[in-house]
Amino acid sequence: MKKILLIFLLNTSMIFSQNIHVPIDTIVKTNHETIIKGEKIKYTAETGMQPVWDKDGNPIASLFYTYYKRNFSKDLDKKESHRPIIISFNGGPGSGSLWMHIGYTGPRVLKIDDEGFPIQPYGMKTNPYSILDTADIVFVCPVNTGYSRMIPDKNGDLPDRKKFFGINADIKYLATWINTFITRKNRWESPKYIIGESYGGTRVMGLSHELQNSQWMYLNGVILVSPADYKLLEFDDGQEDAIDSSLHLPYYAATAWYHKMLDKEIQSIDLLEFLPKVEEFTINELIPAIAKGGFISDIERNEIAEKYSYYSGLDKDFIIDYNLDIPNYAFWKELLRKRDGLTIGRLDSRYRGIDRTNAGSRPDTNIELNSWNHSFTPAINHYVRNELKFETDIKYNVFGPVHPWNKENDNTRKNLRKAMAQNPFLKVFIQSGYYDGATNYFQAKYTMWQVDPSGKMKDRFYFEGYRSGHMMYLRNEDLKKSNDDLREFIKNSSTNGMPAKY
């Protein structure tokens, strides 16, 4: 029988949304047990709403969170405050935390098949690979995602959206929220980690610096899952430069290999034997060729196009028509057009879709996102209400209204380097799926290379690739490996008995 404890910390303060009221400072606790890696684990799940305070101490928003804390027998000398804690964010911007919550590290996950495709009837199952045996986990929904909302003042006016919806505003208020959470839960002595998926990668790069310099909270690790680096993804004129454009090719090659669109010679070898050759070609030949623009010789253009075709499965003439610079949307439309009459997914290019016509320059829809939305959405709503016992009539925003999003002054990559330079203990782990076309794995490698141009901290960076897409943890083999990789990263970033110095 689950023990349920409901605590209303601020009974009179309410958050208002479409005439639906929920307490802004609430905790619901339920007790559970599960099996992780063959070991029985007892844990408490705490769901709730915790306010974001302004400088005058007034609540301006309340964030929905789920906090999983492992319980130990009294006869075991386990000090909770010394146990690692991981704070988890998804991306968007505007996405709730459901994806990694019920897809990756949490103790309960979505029912999916071994290759990571959701199966009906949709529901939840035990996650035997969850990192809860090693670390406590907090899943946080930023403002306007999940159940998180802005709070009106006494006059009924909502706060200025600029306080929340932008790269730097997002980092600033979330850092204050994390400080409040760590203080309330008495976790200042715990080794601390932040993990972010997709745009969450940008978020946690920035948080590493903000937490250290504004909240005096030093981290053991930053984990980037399929990270979105806006230095690569955003362009004033919509045109990529030679480097950014070229970084797509290794992903194109991996995807073409998966769909068996390459020569028999390549299809006969393993993906990980093949990709280093493509990466070398990209760095040493493709980038210099595209950098020459219209002044490249016809001979070199033809040679590069032939190699590009060999590695990507695209026709040489198609590549030449695009001036060796293939946009990712064109690749998703073109790769299977002639052979199968199908498109491929953006976030997970193992998915295939059917367009209204074979003609066109880009797919009609993101077929993989449609699949995920109609499987994750009912699962998270049912799980939170029926297993975690958090009840509200407010809508769970899988994707919430956060736009326009201020992308100015993005210094997150530089600030991660500063945070690492300030903190000799801080390590960074990057996880990417080879079939992710939105934030591809080679872009993630490039970001890793560029964070510290001096190379003096390169031994504190770790990278792992997985044979899946954006949510690389959906495939069962990768769910196991990626969680094990997180355990190893936590172990390797332990600093017990070590002085914080170079």
What are these regions (language model features)?
Residues 18-85:
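Catalytic-loop region of hydrolases
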Residues 57-163, 449:
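N-terminal cap/lid subdomain of alpha/beta-hydrolase-fold enzymes
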Residues 107-111, 208, 212-307:
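A catalytic-pocket lid/entrance helix-loop region that shapes and gates access to the active site
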Residues 132, 142, 162-182:
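Alpha/beta-hydrolase active-site loop
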Residues 187-199:
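Alpha/beta-hydrolase fold nucleophile elbow
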Residues 206, 426, 440-450:
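Short alpha-helix in the alpha/beta-hydrolase fold that links the catalytic acid
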Residues 293-438:
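Alpha/beta-hydrolase fold catalytic core
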Residues 467-478:
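Catalytic histidine-centered segment of alpha/beta-hydrolase-like enzymes
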